[in-house]
């Protein structure tokens, strides 16, 4: 009984349209940021290094290099703070988790583009 109600509520909250993306893809995530009374969108562009598919609890981690420092941010896929996700380029990788990119820098950290 309660399980069906929970599933129905989760289905309503998961109604947001999310583009298909995978680890290795370069994405631009538009995040809603509230500063005092104002609310604006902030873009976070980087490589998806991991994805967790758990229905409403799905999440993904994006890594970028900002002024020589590696920055990683984990987003909840269906969070109301995530405004939009745009796939900029597809990456050709063989692993599901790209945590090895944390140890690489410069040209070694590049990902080959998927030609389809």
UniProtKB/Swiss-Prot annotation:
InterPro entries: Ribosomal_bL19 (IPR001857), Ribosomal_bL19_CS (IPR018257), Ribosomal_bL19_sf (IPR038657), Translation_prot_SH3-like_sf (IPR008991). Gene3D superfamilies: 2.30.30.790. GO terms for molecular function: structural constituent of ribosome. GO terms for biological process: translation. Pfam families: Ribosomal_L19. The keyword ATP-binding does not apply. One of its GO terms (cellular component) is cytosolic large ribosomal subunit. Keywords: Ribonucleoprotein, Ribosomal protein. The keyword Nucleus does not apply. SUPFAM superfamilies: Translation proteins SH3-like domain. Disulfide bonds: none annotated. It comes from the Bacteria. NCBIfam families: rplS_bact. This protein is located at the 30S-50S ribosomal subunit interface and may play a role in the structure and function of the aminoacyl-tRNA binding site. Belongs to the bacterial ribosomal protein bL19 family. This is Large ribosomal subunit protein bL19. It comes from Azotobacter vinelandii (strain DJ / ATCC BAA-1303).
């Amino acid at each position: 009984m309660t399980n069906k109600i929970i599933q129905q509520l989760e289905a309503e909250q998961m109604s947001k349209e999310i583009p298909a993306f995978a680890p290795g893809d370069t994405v631009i995530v538009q995040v809603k940021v509230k500063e005092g009374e104002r609310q604006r969108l902030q873009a976070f562009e980087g490589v998806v290094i991991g994805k967790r598919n758990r229905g409403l609890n799905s999440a993904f981690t994006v890594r970028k290099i900002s002024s020589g420092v590696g920055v990683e941010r984990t987003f909840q896929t269906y969070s109301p703070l995530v405004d939009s996700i745009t796939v900029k380029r597809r990456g050709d990788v063989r692993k599901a988790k790209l945590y090895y990119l944390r140890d690489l820098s410069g040209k070694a950290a590049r990902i080959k583009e998927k030609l389809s």
